[in-house]
Amino acid sequence: MNEVLNAIKSRRTIRKFKPDSISEEKIKAILEAGRWAPSFSNLQPWKFIVIKDQKIKKELDKVAKETVLHLGINEAPAVICVCVDRRIDPLHAIESGASAAQNMALAGHSLGLGVGWIGTFGTDAEKGIQKLLQLPETTRVIALLPVGIADESPKGSRKPVEEFIQFR
């Protein structure tokens, strides 16, 4: 099977991490994958914040508790906060940020790391994260991506393709 399709099909959201650190080289490779995500008119409205400080991660975990799947923030050696500046692209920034987050999740997986995905957009947690990280109101927080060495291997499942695809 094609490497990209294999990565897409085998990637899982990870919520449990080993305490081992990860290299700066791998973090930079993940960020580089986000940088190459598609964006409307190539506006690239994103900003990526890498959080390693345990104190900040603890606060981030408290703020993110509103989201159902906030697990992994404290345990992961790094958390990437994916943001977009809606002044740059008010209509498509969210899609661009989600594309960048997906690229980073796939890149982390391809590098042998586990990556979580905590959706924060439009929640009270988003406002708390903006405040904690001192982000301007024009910056939207799309997702938090805890990154590290996975301490779990969740099984994946999907609906049959016939349930949601139409050809006309």
Feature-to-residue mapping (PLM):
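Acidic, surface-exposed loops and disordered segments
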Residues: 1-168
